[in-house]
Amino acid sequence: MRIENIGFIGLGAMGSVMAPLLGKSGYNVLGYDIGSKIEKSTGVSQVQSLNDLKNMDVIIFMLPNSKIVAQVINELLDINTKSILIDMSSSDPRETKQLGKTLQDKGINFLDAPVSGGVSRAKTGNLMIMAGGKLEHIKIVKNLLSVMGKVQFAGPLGSGHAIKALNNYVSAAGLIASFEALATARSFGIEPENFLKIINGATGKNNTTEVKLDKFVVSEKFNSGFALDLMVKDVSIANSLVKDLTTKNPLSKSVSHYLSKTLEELGGNPDHTEVYKVLLKN
């Protein structure tokens, strides 16, 4: 199957930088978003109706949650049953599997391929893409997805969304631990520069200590581009997945609860690195 025409639904923080990569790589990309706009100079032609996407080879979704993805797909089914559908959002894997069964009955190929790496890596096409679904279908779209990052096969449909949520839970746990450690180290007179050199040269290093602390926290910029409410959503999904497996989920439960309460305390739409502010205040 030759893939030329791509529909990209969701042109927010991530979609607005992912879709242009496809356009600049030679694909005919039509973008759709009810709230965001994108310039044609990016290589993406924005359309005003889902009807304009009826002849696409592939339709990609980069939307806030599973329910919105399902709503949009239900609207698309009235006009298009030929495209390969790829949900690159951070969706609930259980809802992805359920939606997949419905689409399979209609003969529609559906894949989940969420991403990790944030806006900075999205801009350079260096995302980690976690692909779930039938391997033969993933092979069809692998070259397309590879424009946006490294494609790693996760397993059957829903596995991509599962590992995305679990990855963000592990990342969030490391973030909270790193923030606590930095604040405590400072109380002992340890300068942030020395803290980072020691931790990153020892066994405690993680993505937060290697990437986020100096750039977004110590600098007090708090502008990583990943909103706290999205982290709360992902960790909540992960916590519920762990809970489905075992009632012994003390850490995922604690991380999920702490982040939810912190989001309430901060108010507005804070960056996830602003969790450090609340930790210091308390």
Please tell me what each predicted stretch does.
Residues 63, 90-169:
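Rossmann-fold dinucleotide-binding core
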Residues 193-201, 253-257:
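Beta-strand segments within the central parallel beta-sheet cores of soluble alpha/beta enzyme folds
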Residues 50-108:
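Rossmann-fold NAD(P) dinucleotide-binding segment
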Residues 157, 211-272:
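Interdomain hinge/lid region at the active-site interface
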Residues 1-54, 58-61, 152:
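NAD(P)+-binding Rossmann beta1-loop-alpha1 motif at the extreme N-terminus of oxidoreductases
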Residues 29, 46, 109-111, 152, ...:
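Hydrophobic beta-strand scaffold residues
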Residues 124-131, 157-188, 200-212, 230-233:
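Active-site-proximal catalytic alpha-helix in oxidoreductases
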